[in-house]
Amino acid sequence: MITIKKGLDLPIAGVPTQVINDGKSITKVALLGEEYVGMRPTMHVRVEDVVKKGQVLFADKKNPGVVFTAPVSGKVVEINRGAKRVLQSVVIAVEGEEQVTFNSYAANELVSLDRETIKTQLVDSGAWTALRTRPFSKVPAIDSETKAIFVTAMDTNPLAADAEVIINQQEEAFVAGLDLLSVLTGDKVYVCKKGGSLPRSSQKNVEEHVFDGPHPAGLAGTHMHYLYPVDTNHVAWSIGYQDVIAFGQLFLTGEIYSERIVSLAGPAVNNPRLVRTITGASLVDLTDSEVMPGEVRVISGSVLNGTQAAGPHAYLGRYHQQVSVLREGREKELFGWAVPGKNKFSVTRSFLSHLFSGQLFNMTTTTNGSDRAMVPIGNYERVLPLDMEATMLLRDLCAGDVDSAQRLGALELDEEDLGLCTYVCPGKYEYGPMLREILDTIEKEG
């Protein structure tokens, strides 16, 4: 067991009950183009085209062979683009049940398949896009290989679902997915989990590792840091546990598995719980009658690093396993810093609330102040459990110092790894976008 001591479990109200329920009926789903780092689409469909489940919607011209397929059958009703023609979303109105089918296999046949057969079916079905590289967090090239695949079979994000509850409902598919990954890498598959019992693969190159401690103990970046540190010469791949299940279902049934179980939770949710829905589901549909009255912000993903779900982005993200809802914090408070703060949370124990352990807080979207200077008071070191000089690295991100940031470990990180640093920052800096700019520059300059 690897025990993480640094970090923070955010005491936010609206914790979900760990029981799976059916979600609202979904009328629209979408693929969100901006989720795929560096992707340049070649469109295969137009508005009004009728598509089957599993049909190619667009391909990546910068990553030849990688295709993105429809998670449902229906009609393409929107293709949304932003500044510089960046693809924002391809929206499908759900209709019918037609689908593209693929080869199916018995569970005991999977480990005897060759790597090329597995890779081809994953690529053709669009399931390949569930994999992400580290460094850079991109969909891997179809001719690339890795010596390490990390399965994130736990989730320590605030308000997250318990991975064990979901995996134990799909034991056969999860093991099948692990067997496929064991062939895909030929080297090691690291299944990273919290304490508890999960179905296990019998393949010798599939290893289980237990992580314990506060968030970010459940992030792939943390697991890689301790088990297989990455750089440009040591590339690892990561995949979420629900995508491992989808891999298994694809090969066991020959059909694309689009079901996604998400945590619908937060202080502004009427009945926080786990709900069954579809990959890319409309969050307008999913949250209908689920949120409290008033102005709220719906977030696809975690409150620490998710994306605001509004307009052309109002859909469940490809890599997200939760939907969080917060009240918009627009109220101004006179001399808020001077009150005891019994109902306010502070990492630095600035408020009276730190005397009441176990208290959950109705947090909002407010930043509690305007932008200001970055102040190194030890907050970053308190929540970043990686062997890095946190303050120095974050300072380099602010300054855009590519060389120094790379030396200090920026290549090991993804935006989600800095979510807590953003949360505890007294200067209100958003470190995720700064990190992405640095990573893009490093990749561009080779």
Swiss-Prot record:
Keywords: Ion transport, NAD, Sodium, Sodium transport, Translocase, Transport, Ubiquinone. It is an enzyme of class 7 (translocase). It catalyses: a ubiquinone + n Na(+)(in) + NADH + H(+) = a ubiquinol + n Na(+)(out) + NAD(+). Its EC number is 7.2.1.1. It comes from the Bacteria. InterPro entries: NqrA (IPR008703), NQRA_2nd (IPR056148), NqrA_C_domain (IPR022615), NQRA_N (IPR056147). The keyword Disulfide bond does not apply. This is Na(+)-translocating NADH-quinone reductase subunit A. The gene is nqrA.
